[in-house]
Amino acid sequence: QRQMCIRDRTYAVQGEFAEIKWPDAEVYYVRTGIGKVKAAFHLAEAIRQVEPDIVINMGTAGTIHHKVGDIFVCRHFIDRDMQKLAGLGLSYQLDTSALLEQKGFCKHWTESATCNTGDSFLTELTDIEGDVVDMEAYAQAFVCNSKEIPFISVKYVSDVIGQNSVKHWEDKLADARTGLSHFFNVLKESI
């Protein structure tokens, strides 16, 4: 068992914070704020200061196809804002699996889901690609990929899009903290 310095575990709002208690890891927490720009900026600053071995994004997400309380381990990311410009040849997808594998992280985390990220909080059903939707993960994956730092995102489904999403998100933050804490401290216990 190796000693490692995770150092960056990101979350958007205080209500999503859940402590990770892994004996073989030093964890540094970064509250990035909501949205792609804030998430990218605050993560880049933290990376510059602490040079982490891996970045784990933890938080809530909406869904169309799954149920509240489900937890997804995301390795594939879509920027739904850039996806609209795909016809112009712009990239809008990232997969972080190769770097995780190359650096030896999350080998026993067999789950693999897709997170769809955009600048708006989705409240109405729309045609989106992916298992969950959020407002930060793609931007963080982009920053990490650019700096060759492994990245993974763990999302707790707090709301089903189109079913009073904003209200459900606010009401489910405590459940999300409990679910994410159980995921990291009981189910996974290490990276």
Description of each model-found segment:
Residues 18-191:
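Glycine-rich phosphate- or other oxyanion-binding loops that anchor nucleotides, phosphorylated ligands
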Residues 7-11:
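Short hydrophobic beta-strand segments
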Residues 12-16:
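Short polar catalytic/cofactor-binding loops
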Residues 1-6:
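Short, small-residue-biased leader/transition segments that mark boundaries at the very start
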